[in-house]
Structures are given as C-alpha cells and as structure tokens.
Amino acid sequence: ICACLVGSEMCIRDRYMDAVGDDLGATCGNIINCSYKLFVQTKPDGVLVLGDTNSCLSVIGAKRLHIPIFHMEAGNRCKDECLPEETNRRIVDIISDVNMAYSEHARRYLADCGLPKERTYVTGSPMAEVLRNNLAEIEVSDVHQRLALEKGKYILLSAHREENIDTEKNFFSLFTAINAMADKYDMPILYSCHPRSRNRLQASGF
C-alpha cells in the first residue's frame, strides 16, 4: 500500500506529488500528470481514492493504464452543479471499477447514473473505525492544556467551503455571525482552519 499526497495537508504519506499549481487548471493537470507517472513507475494492483477532492482526478491516469479503480464515499450528491466537488464525484463514480457507497441513499444515486449493481457496494462509513482506532490517543491528549481550553467551554468550528470563503458577502456574513456567537456565549472558538480560510482571515483582518 502506497499513500500518496498531492498537496493537501496530511500527516501520513509515502509519496508526495507537488501538484499545487498557480491556478486550478494547472493543479488539476499536475495531479493527472504526476499520478500517471507514479502509476507507470510503481505498477499498482489498484488505485483507491476517497471522497471528491481534486486529488481524485488521479483516476483518469489509472483508467488509461487499465488499473482497477476503487472509489470510497461514492454516490454522494448535493445537487449543486456550482460546487467543484459535484463534478469530481460524477467523473470518479462513472469511471471507477468498484464504487463503495456509504449508504443505501448514495447507492441509489449511482443506480440513477446507470451504474450496474455489480460495480456498487454499500460499505457504510469508516468513521466508527477511525474513532475507535484513535480513541486511546484522544483520551490522553493534552490539547486542552496546550490551548488553554476548558472542556465543554469552547466552540469547535469547521468552515472552509469555497462558496463560504471565497465569496466576500458570504465570508463576512459567516464570520460576523461566528463572532456574535462567541460574544453571546462568552466562549473561545477553536477553528480547524484550511489554508484558504487562514489566508482570507488574515487578509480581511478578522
């Protein structure tokens, strides 16, 4: 098993493909090019991709090389064609050899796309296994002490979607509301921050 990273933040990786380009077109092209070269070099028995990020576009090279493709989190849909993830999902679902849907609902979306049932399996979400495998480390973590936080007395925030961060109106509306919430409940906010969000916050002065 070889875990590959194309540019997002991840602590476990065997190969790093510096695929981040100057713009979206360059990044997507780099992902396909770098992964294709890696597949030629390593000759994998299969390629497993998770989710709907741009890194999933690596399957295009795998398909051309006749390498079996396995897609975890297949079949998810939000029915919003403006979201880049929706395009990625459709591409990867269609060309994957095996689609692993987390729910029966997602499986039905795959069936609606015309995918044969022998290429689709409902596996359930791996979240329970992820939590169980990391529970011991979570329980002894000193993160509250390091960040000077009191258990149950802070707000955990995750907000990184492109339409919320890159659209100025949505961005200011979102973080004005977040600041108001912090003031109302008199709690600090712990923000698990994507690089795009961090840069936007620094530039805006929030």
Residue ranges of each PLM-predicted region?
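Active-site and donor-binding regions of nucleotide-sugar-utilizing enzymes
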Residues: Y16-P116
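Donor-nucleotide binding loops and adjacent catalytic segments primarily
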Residues: V6-S8, I138-F206
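Phosphate- and divalent-cation-binding pockets in alpha/beta enzyme and binding domains
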Residues: L57-S58, Y109, V130, N199-L201
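Short, hinge-like loop/turn segments at secondary-structure boundaries
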Residues: S8-E9, L65-H66, E86-R90, K117-E118, ...
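Conserved beta-strand segments of alpha/beta enzyme cores
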Residues: R13-R15, R119-Y121, P188
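Single conserved hydrophobic/aromatic residue that forms the stacking wall/gate
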Residues: I1-G7, C11-I12
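A nucleotide-sugar donor-handling region in carbohydrate enzymes
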Residues: A19, I95-N170
